[in-house]
Amino acid sequence: MSNPTASVRRGARPDLLDPTALSQLGGIEFIAREVVEGFIMGLHRSPHRGFSAEFADHRAYQAGDDLRYIDWRMYGRSDRYHVKQFEEETNLRAYLLLDVSESMGWSSNPSTLPNKLWYAKHLAASIALILLRQGDSVGVAAFHNQIVERMQPKGGRRQWHEIARRIRPLNAEGGTSAEGALRELAMRLQRRGLVILLSDLLVDRDETIRALKFLRHHGHEVLVFHIIDPGERELPPASEARFFDPETNDELLVSVADIRAEYREAVNDALGEWYRDLRPNGIDYEVIDTDRPLSLALRAYMRKRERLG
């Protein structure tokens, strides 16, 4: 078996690795940092307005800036003037809303494919790092039946390490109430910003859509990452399949041949309905399979961020 770490050392971009290889590289901070560095390398920076490799706690000195805030230590290291940047100067406030319900712990092939929560955590950490490097502030809320972890939006290098530390130990457990988490978040957000939902959307559909519309009505930009396992798109190559709901423990045994085409059509219809319900309301919606490189999701995020200026 090839060593994925060796591939990265030979110059392969980590953001283009499949999640199976990526999961062998190390912990969440290392992986997210490697993914983002590879992604930035691929951007060539110039097409992306406002992108900066510096963290939010510093920015380049501009004529008229208060000289009291020049960081002289940084000047000594880089021979360039930088001023200390405070939280209220950041461009955007963003909130990552992470689904940690029991269904997120599922993988169609646990021996080779990371589960949905692993993917969502690493995507969240990668987006958080990009946000902070752009001078934005970012917070996180994790939920199942209720919000179980919350961090207020802040900028700066330390915030990213704290985000990674807080989401790393979260396990997939409990049922899902995205609607409750979204409404609670809307009530707590004091300024308009960007809300990014990362979920498998095994939720009450109508309630969740109403809550997402509620956020848009209050002036927030919303981006939904629908995290799905490729095994949820297609039935396995077997004569029978056992359907199991990890949140209710209900089971159903069926003949695969009898329902394969119908199942595929039902899945595509369900994904299409999410798209048709959300996009006309100004809510960006992206389906992300857990066997795909994280760079695909990062591109979707960057498209959204560029539109916000």
Q: Which positions does each model-derived feature cover?
A:
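Von Willebrand factor
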Residues: 159-193, 205-206, 228-229, 233
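C-terminal functional segments of enzyme domains
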Residues: 182-186, 190, 194-198, 202-207, ...
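Aromatic-lined glycan-binding groove of carbohydrate-active enzymes
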Residues: 220-228
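Conserved, well-ordered alpha-helix/loop/beta-strand core segments that scaffold catalytic motifs
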Residues: 273-304
